[in-house]
A protein has these predicted regions:
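Catalytic beta-strand-to-alpha-helix segment of the class III nucleotidyl cyclase homology domain
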Residues: 60-164
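Catalytic NTP-binding/metal-coordinating core of nucleotidyl cyclase/transferase enzymes
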Residues: 2-70
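Intrinsically disordered or compositionally simple regulatory linkers and C-terminal tails
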Residues: 1-17, 150-165
Length: 165
């Protein structure tokens, strides 16, 4: 279901700033359920995402930050309930800005976590159900960013500390 899309170069906001949703897996043992990649991509595309071919299993671009967060939460929730694989859990990162920054945010997440950056919090007016986790300098070309843990994916949220490099 992945369709090719070329991420804009850093600083190119010709289409306006994009919100990226990046998804990888935390695998502990032998996955028991089906691979959730196509399932997750269908959910994101239904929410208006453009899928981007990448080494990471799922990378999506949204024009609307609210839609990006909503569909990241839906993808997490539905995967937990409909696939229910205790050995393969989604790690989700959401960032409004550059794709490489979104990937860095995702790499801070553990399985069953949706982590988002301060740009997402600002763009949504601080209205998301979340708790602040860390002020981290996860990319070298800017100031530290506040990382937030979405609490909308309860009851299966993972409260472990983030994977800050």
């Amino acid at each position: 279901m992945t369709t090719p899309d070329t991420p804009r170069p850093p600083g190119d906001h010709s289409k306006g700033p994009q919100t990226y949703v990046c998804i990888d897996y935390e695998v502990d043992g032998e996955p028991q359920g089906r691979d959730p990649q196509n399932f997750v991509e269908e959910i994101l595309v239904a929410g208006g995402a453009a899928m981007i071919s990448h080494d990471i299993p799922v990378v999506a671009s949204f024009d609307d930050v609210g839609a990006a967060m909503e569909h990241a939460i839906i993808a997490q929730w539905r995967t937990q309930r409909e696939i229910n694989d205790r050995d393969r859990k989604l790690r989700i990162g959401v960032h409004l800005g550059e794709l490489d920054h979104a990937i860095a945010v995702m790499r801070c997440a553990n399985g069953n976590q949706i982590v988002f950056s301060g740009t997402v919090d600002s763009a949504t007016g601080g209205m998301l159900d979340a708790r602040p986790m860390a002020l981290a300098n996860i990319w070298s070309d800017s100031e530290p960013t506040q990382l937030w843990l979405s609490t909308d994916s309860r009851p299966d949220i993972d409260g472990r500390p983030l994977r800050i490099p």
